[in-house]
UniProtKB/Swiss-Prot annotation:
Keywords linked to the UniProt accession: Amino-acid biosynthesis, Cytoplasm, Histidine biosynthesis, Lyase
Alphabetized InterPro entries for the sequence: Aldolase_TIM (IPR013785), His_biosynth (IPR006062), HisF (IPR004651), IGPS_HisA/HisF (IPR050064), RibuloseP-bd_barrel (IPR011060)
Compartment(s) of residence: Cytoplasm
Free-text function comment from the UniProt entry: IGPS catalyzes the conversion of PRFAR and glutamine to IGP, AICAR and glutamate. The HisF subunit catalyzes the cyclization activity that produces IGP and AICAR from PRFAR using the ammonia provided by the HisH subunit.
A Pfam family per the record: His_biosynth
Keyword Signal among record annotations: no
Example of a GO biological process term: L-histidine biosynthetic process
Membrane spanning stretches: none
Coiled coil region boundaries: none
Protein name: Imidazole glycerol phosphate synthase subunit HisF
Source organism per UniProt: Polaromonas naphthalenivorans (strain CJ2)
Record Gene3D superfamilies: Aldolase class I
Sequence similarity: Belongs to the HisA/HisF family.
Length: 259
């Protein structure tokens, strides 16, 4: 059985790492290069770096920060936020990223996933899905489930999250980064129903994201949600737990991890 991965996430805006609740109320967590180096030393399996306001601000890729982070990190680095084109993938890989994450651009032009995967390989194409559970009123009209949001969680696309994940995997995404907007920053645990629904529907790895408050939540994402990797931010950024503690805890619950 393949080892399950623990992936600290750096949400970056204005050149600083931040963490919010339900995608708002952002709080400063520090310098991205310093934080990335710390996680590298702690034994993180990978790092995810998301420029969370690039798309909504219409900004270009912050390549100088990515180059600085990549120089400190010797584990796979995924970069997302403002990734729009196949050319952007090339620029990020040249800057030191190992994988690139598409979100809003894939919604605007799904063909970009097909093209980027064909050119650079599925292994370096991640599709990030920000999903929110339908309201009770919506569920009465359309059935229970989750909608996909774009532009940093600001815009409901009306697309079903599970169906979108399936389409993205078929188009060549090598991985799905699945965030529950309802759980983001709440520390109440992953939306395991959402995680399981997507994990069961696609054959590519699913990274669970949004809501980790303790180490059992990480293990639950794998054992109950079916995730191949678990992503967390605040529990690591503010020193509540180290990556090594998280790995030991997952191992104690019978989950294969790289210790």
């Amino acid at each position: 059985m393949l080892a399950k991965r623990i992936i600290p996430c750096l949400d970056v805006t204005g050149g600083r790492v931040v963490k919010g609740v339900n995608f708002v109320e952002l709080r400063d967590a520090g310098d991205p290069v310093e934080i990335a180096a710390r996680y590298n030393d702690q034994g993180a399996d990978e790092l995810t770096f998301l420029d969370i306001t690039a798309t909504s601000d219409g900004r270009d890729l912050i390549l100088h920060i990515i180059e600085a982070v990549a120089s400190q990190v010797f584990i796979p680095l995924t970069v997302g936020g403002g990734v729009r084109t196949v050319e952007d993938v090339r620029r990020l890989l040249n800057a030191g990223a190992d994988k690139t994450s598409f979100n809003s651009a894939a919604l605007a032009n799904p063909q970009v996933i097909t093209d980027a995967s064909a050119k650079y390989g599925a292994q370096c194409i991640v599709v990030a899905i920000d999903a929110k559970r339908r309201s009770d009123e919506d569920a009465l009209l359309r059935g229970a489930g989750w909608d996909v949001y774009s532009h940093g969680g600001r815009k409901n696309t009306g697309l079903d999250a599970v169906a979108w994940a399936v389409e993205m995997a078929q188009r060549g995404a090598g991985e799905i980064l699945l965030t529950s907007m309802n759980r983001d920053g709440t520390k109440s645990g992953f939306d395991l129903e959402l995680t399981r629904a997507v994990s069961d529907a696609v054959s590519v790895p699913v990274i669970a994201s949004g809501g980790v408050g303790n180490l059992d939540h990480l293990a639950d994402g794998v054992q109950l949600g079916g995730a191949d990797a678990v992503l967390a931010a605040s529990i690591f950024h503010y020193g509540e737990y180290t990556v090594a503690q998280a790995k030991r805890h997952m191992a104690s619950r019978g989950i294969p991890v790289r210790l």
